[in-house]
């Protein structure tokens, strides 16, 4: 099962709000998911983001692939840097 970390659109028309979910890559965008690991609100001036850092690092360690947008969000939060340091410091 290929697992992705991606955005699920919530909110109403013209007022999007996103949940950052871990889901099977074959599931529809707003369909079945495994776990919610954060939220993203692009309408707030500072792009409000909440993340469960420990769960995201665990999923990345288990092989989950983030989408391009989620990868950018995680990079700005510093989570991708922590993941790469943990992954390559073992060797």
Curated annotation (Swiss-Prot):
Q: Which SUPFAM superfamilies match?
A: Ribosomal protein S16 (SSF54565)
Q: Which GO terms describe its cellular component?
A: cytoplasm; small ribosomal subunit
What GO molecular function terms would the record report?
A: structural constituent of ribosome
A Pfam match: Ribosomal_S16
Q: Which UniProt keywords apply?
A: Ribonucleoprotein, Ribosomal protein
A biological process (GO) annotation for this entry? translation
What HAMAP family does the record tag this protein with? Answer: Ribosomal_bS16
Q: Which family does it belong to?
A: Belongs to the bacterial ribosomal protein bS16 family.
Task: Output this protein's name.
Answer: Small ribosomal subunit protein bS16
What is the source species?
Streptococcus mutans serotype c (strain ATCC 700610 / UA159)
- Which lineage? Bacteria, Bacillati, Bacillota, Bacilli, Lactobacillales
């Amino acid at each position: 099962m290929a697992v992705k970390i991606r955005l699920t659109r919530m909110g109403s028309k013209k007022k999007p709000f996103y949940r950052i979910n871990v889901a099977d890559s074959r599931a529809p965008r707003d369909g079945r998911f495994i776990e919610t690991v954060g939220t993203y609100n692009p309408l707030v001036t500072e792009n409000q983001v909440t993340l469960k850092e420990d769960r995201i690092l665990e999923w990345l360690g288990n092989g989950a692939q983030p989408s391009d947008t989620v990868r950018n969000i995680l990079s700005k939060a510093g989570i991708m840097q922590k993941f790469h340091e943990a992954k390559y410091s073992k060797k």
